[in-house]
Swiss-Prot record:
Binds 2 [4Fe-4S] clusters. This is Tetrachloroethene reductive dehalogenase. Its EC number is 1.21.99.5. Keywords: 4Fe-4S, Cell membrane, Iron, Iron-sulfur, Membrane, Metal-binding, Oxidoreductase, Repeat, Signal. It is found in: Cell membrane. It is a peripheral membrane protein. InterPro entries: 4Fe4S_Fe-S-bd (IPR017896), 4Fe4S_Fe_S_CS (IPR017900), RDH (IPR012832), TAT_signal (IPR006311), TAT_signal_bac_arc (IPR019546). The gene is pceA.
Length: 551
């Protein structure tokens, strides 16, 4: 509990109890908020640490980016055997019905396959084909999955798909995108694309020009440089920003780029894709084209060795997320992915004009969550996501590597791990039952992991094969674990309630109930979210409310 005296403990206990007692009356929020903040600061003060806050075993090895759920999709070997969950039936662990175990068979049926489960590749390509709008979802007539909702989703993801090389899936180095040339004399657009660098562009040719002209900007100190970079990053579009030291542990052991081949589309244009879309749509099965693999050689591909990483967070829309698992919730995720590329590119240009090398990245190149933890932006939660103090897990992370030496931030602890031990709402809300129900995180061993997990770090198990299987069935990404999270809410005072509750025994059992008493989140049970009409009502509210609810 830390160094607190008896009087302060009693004060905090009474304040925490008072918060619980009045939790059904929203009129008192303004009164309770400062009291709860005081209690939280006494009982669960925010702390900083110089070391990485989670255990990393000596056996830890860097993660191969081609192992993650989405990149693994394009390995032809993954199309030879049925998708494999870590636990075939989790009901023996949770004591509840396993709502995810039948997904591989359901997805196979959607593809016209009889008598066997879908492969990993078939599962993921089913998702991608629906996500790109090339195939209707099975819910396309339902509120939240209509043509209107899908059109918004397409617009939100457009920059990520068209100008970022779909680095949301991972990969590196940088991004390559197909664009259609235009004849400036006739204004005719070609039907055959050419491959060019995307917004995650590692071309640092301008840096040497700045240096040769003696124009490299000199900062008075690492601290000043960090202050300036943070200010610039916020102006250029980030909602939160921190500085992490370059840590080789988080750089992927293998970089890779999906091999794209020309596919003739119904409109007559050629589109480069990493799978044969026309063949799939004509009933010919799923065929993928593999990867081009790269050694993680910074000097070869970016021209420098990183010293610092600028890590930033983009908030996702609260109203859109609470419609999960509808397509509207996917739209705010897509907007963030599109903005990640734009903001990272602008930060990289800023650094290059100052005479410093930069490599803008999304999910590619290295693991974002531990870098964000090192940058002081949040803690790692039960659902495997970064939990920030302001937005909870309702955000996306991007980063820019640079050779500019910056003063790093320190990891911060504000009660997330303690709360996640008690809450388990994200695990209960997962339609695929992909998130561990175990109380405590642990250093995962190989036998604890499914194929896309990296062992020997301290965390809760998350089965991406189950998660991705529901995405395929749903026809859209799912954000249930974000929507129900108590740290997701737009009013930060209930985050303080959560911090207090984890430290006071009498309140621990009610830790996950506080935001529910105020009507946040909606049903936790994934079936009830849909069957009760909650998701449909949230979609209607989203379209009927012209103003976004902001933090």
């Amino acid at each position: 509990m830390g160094e607190i005296n008896r009087r302060n403990f009693l004060k905090a206990s009474m304040l925490g109890a008072a918060a619980a007692a009045v939790a059904s009356a929203s009129v008192v929020k303004g009164v309770v908020s400062p009291l709860v903040a005081d209690a939280a600061d006494i009982v669960a003060p925010i702390t900083e640490t110089s070391e990485f806050p989670y255990k990393v075993d000596a056996k830890y090895q860097r993660y191969n980016s081609l192992k993650n759920f989405f990149e693994k999709t394009f390995d032809p070997e993954e199309n030879k055997t049925p998708i494999k969950f870590h636990y075939d039936d989790v009901s023996k662990i949770t004591g509840k019905k396993d709502t995810g175990k039948d997904l591989p068979m359901l997805n196979a049926e959607r593809l016209g396959i009889k008598g066997r489960p879908a492969t990993h590749t078939e599962t993921s390509i089913l998702f991608h084909t629906q996500h790109l709008g090339a195939m209707l979802t099975q819910r396309h007539n339902e509120t939240g999955w209509t043509g209107l909702d899908e059109a918004l989703n397409a617009g939100a993801w457009a920059v990520e798909f068209d100008y970022s090389g779909f680095n949301a899936a991972g990969g590196g180095p940088g991004s390559a995108i197909p664009l259609y040339p235009i004849n400036p004399m006739t204004n005719e657009i070609a039907n055959e694309p050419v491959m060019v660098p995307g917004l995650y562009n590692w071309d640092n040719i301008d840096v040497e020009s700045v240096r040769q002209q003696g124009q490299q900007w000199k900062f008075e100190s690492k601290e000043e440089a960090s202050k300036i970079l943070k200010k610039a990053t916020r102006l250029l579009g980030a909602d939160l920003v921190g500085i992490a030291p370059y840590d080789e542990r988080w750089t992927y052991s293998t970089w890779g780029r999906k091999i794209q081949k020309p596919c003739k589309m119904p409109n007559g244009r050629t589109k480069y894709l990493p799978w044969d879309l026309p063949k799939m749509l004509s009933g010919g099965g799923v065929e993928v084209f593999g990867h081009a693999k790269f050694e993680p050689d910074w000097e070869k591909y970016a021209g420098f060795k990183p010293k610092s990483v600028i890590v930033f967070v983009l908030e996702e829309d609260y109203e859109a997320i609470r419609t999960s698992p509808s397509v509207i919730s996917s739209a705010t995720v897509g907007k963030s992915y599109s903005n990640m590329a734009e903001v990272a590119y602008k930060i990289a240009v800023f650094l290059r004009k100052l005479g410093y090398y930069a490599a803008p990245c999304g999910n590619d190149t290295g693991i974002s969550v531990p870098m964000a933890v090192q940058a002081g932006l949040g803690e790692a939660g039960r659902n495997g996501l970064l939990i920030t103090q302001k937005f909870g897990p309702r955000h996306r992370i991007a980063k820019v590597y640079t050779d500019l030496e910056l003063a790093p931030d320190k990891p911060r602890k504000f009660g997330v791990r303690e709360f996640c031990r008690l809450c388990k709402k994200c695990a209960d809300a997962c339609p695929a039952q992909a998130i561990s129900h175990e109380k405590d995180p642990k250093v995962l061993q190989p036998e604890d992991c499914e194929a896309s997990e990296n062992p020997y770090t301290e965390k809760w198990h998350v089965d991406s094969e189950r998660c991705g299987s529901f995405w395929a069935y749903n026809g859209s990404p799912c954000s249930n674990c974000v929507a129900v999270c108590s740290w997701n809410k737009v009013e930060t005072w209930n985050h303080d309630v959560a911090r207090v509750a984890t430290q006071i025994p009498l309140l621990q059992d009610a830790a996950r109930k506080f935001d529910e008493w105020f009507g946040y989140s909606g049903p936790v049970n994934p079936d009830e979210r849909l069957e009760s009409g909650y998701v449909q009502n949230m979609v209607k509210d989203f379209w009927n409310n012209p103003e976004s609810i902001k933090q």
